Design a protein with these regions (language model features):
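Short, polar N-cap/turn motifs at the start of nucleic acid-interacting alpha helices
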Residues: 226-232, 330-349
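C-terminal catalytic core of tyrosine-transesterase DNA break-rejoin enzymes
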Residues: 155, 208, 212, 218-219, ...
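N-terminal DNA-binding module of tyrosine recombinases/phage integrases
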Residues: 15-116
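Conserved tyrosine-mediated DNA breakage-rejoining catalytic core shared by Y-recombinases
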Residues: 166-169, 178, 213, 218-265
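Basic, Lys/Arg- and aromatic-enriched nucleic-acid-binding interface segment
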Residues: 132-136, 140-142, 155, 159-217, ...
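Active-site/catalytic core of tyrosine-dependent DNA strand-transfer enzymes
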Residues: 253-311
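N-terminal core-binding DNA-recognition domain of tyrosine site-specific recombinases/integrases
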Residues: 42, 76-151, 155-158, 174-177, ...
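Short basic/aromatic active-site micro-motif
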Residues: 109, 201-203, 310-329
Length: 361
């Protein structure tokens, strides 16, 4: 949970702070280029001056003529509105986009430039530290950011038309096909716990809930007792809360009720969260969107599964969500379970069983 703001900072814009009588702005990581390379930018000694400097800093981007200037404004005004994990990925994308396209005039970008960029970025490379960079998925994400920045450029009046929207056809990413078999689930659930609570017990309950509901990890790990109503589990998908606002009620069954009770019993301490750490806190850091504690626990669980059971191929939590969709009798049921607004997403990504057809007589 983020720390509460100090009394003297309440009422100020986000990331503003009073320090030794002056007003400062804490620059989001990765956006330092738009603030003279500083992490903590001094706005002024009094509030009117601070707002004037802030206004000048924002308006300085209004005459953007290069890609770098466009990306600077995008970093200041658009990226901060996104979810933490998306924001972090966008910041990394901007760094690469600036280095490649930054000096170009806004009107100079053509579809050919985008294709050349993707062709170079799709090749994974290892730097001197051993870190792997690039790849097709990374290239696509970076182009998505550049494309959205140009969409904003049209909105802001910098240009009249998007230079490559509907003109670039990128090669699709290979869909994941891993289907977790029933016997593999049985093997995982048979894994014995070394502790009375938490750890394996929690993951067993998590797996059962995931397979019955198909909930995304971000929703499942945010479940609290407040979501448990008389008629079922009520959720609003975290991912689409600000867009479609999709709400779902998973109606109670004896099996679902048993899985929820198992999750409660597995908690190391009493907590509002259905899944919590030893401090009773939820696993998701709302400020960053990360859940490193849960990731570590899941990783250790899968290591034991591969070592102590007959399962030979690792699977992810996302694969369990796909299994739920694949095992549903109809596409519509799968779509409803996964809280998708469009069944095409469910069909293309999550329905992984081969289609059975009868031959003609």
């Amino acid at each position: 949970m983020p720390k509460p703001r100090k009394k003297e900072n309440k009422g100020l814009p986000a990331r503003w702070q009073i320090d030794h009588g002056a007003y400062y702005y804490h620059v989001p990581p990765g956006l330092e280029a738009a603030w003279d390379g500083k992490k903590k930018f001094k706005l002024g000694k009094n509030l009117p001056e601070a707002y004037r400097v802030w206004s000048d800093r924002i308006s300085a981007t209004e005459a953007a003529s290069t890609v770098a200037q466009l990306l600077d404004r995008y970093a200041l005004e658009v990226i901060p509105t996104k979810k933490p994990t998306t924001r972090a990925g966008n910041v990394l994308a901007l760094k690469k986009l600036r280095s490649v396209f930054g000096a170009l005039p806004l009107s100079a970008i053509t579809p050919r430039h985008v294709y050349m960029f993707v062709d170079q970025r799709r090749k994974k490379k290892t730097d001197e530290t051993g870190k792997v960079t690039g790849g097709l998925t990374v290239a696509h994400r970076e182009v998505e950011v550049l494309s959205h920045a140009y969409t904003k450029a049209v909105e802001w009046g910098y240009i009249n038309n998007h230079p490559f929207k509907n003109e670039v056809r990128l090669e699709g990413e290979k869909a994941r096909t891993r289907y977790v078999e029933d016997w593999e689930i049985i093997e995982c659930l048979a894994l014995e716990s070394k502790h009375k609570k938490g750890s394996v017990h929690a993951i067993h309950a998590y797996v059962r809930l995931k397979l019955m509901t198909g909930m995304a990890r971000s929703d499942l790990l945010r479940l609290t007792v407040a979501n448990l109503k008389d008629d079922g589990i009520h959720i609003q998908r975290h991912k689409t809360a600000g867009s479609t606002g999709k709400r779902t009620i998973y109606e109670w069954t004896p099996e679902l009720n048993a899985a929820v009770e198992a999750a409660k019993q597995a908690r190391p301490v009493l907590s509002p969260f259905l899944f919590c750490n030893r401090k009773g806190e939820g696993y998701i850091d709302e400020e960053t969107g990360n859940c490193h504690g849960w990731d570590s626990m899941w990783g250790r669980f899968m290591d034991r599964v591969l070592k102590e059971t007959e399962v030979k191929e690792r699977f992810t939590e996302h694969d369990l969500r796909a299994k739920c969709a694949s095992d549903a009798e109809t596409l519509e049921h799968a779509r409803a379970l996964l809280s998708h607004a469009d069944a095409r997403t469910t069909e293309a990504i999550y329905r992984r069983k081969p289609e059975r057809v009868k031959p003609l007589k």
